[in-house]
């Protein structure tokens, strides 16, 4: 394993396990994106900007959006990638 691969593995392992498993499952099934809402996964949003930066460093497209759904506000973490 070269230095870049070791760095990427370290970054990947620094992400919450729940997030890693969801991305792996989506890739396995051929999906090109996934998303998480703060209301369902509040622990993912504790360091949300750190998570977005790690995902970007790993080559994913990630962004945080505030959305309104049925008069309630929520925050959404969107993640997409190219295979």
Identify the residue ranges that each predicted region occupies.
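An N-terminal amphipathic alpha-helical segment
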Residues: 1-43
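Short, charge-rich amphipathic interface segments used for partner binding and complex assembly
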Residues: 43-66
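C-terminal edge-of-domain segments
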Residues: 61-83
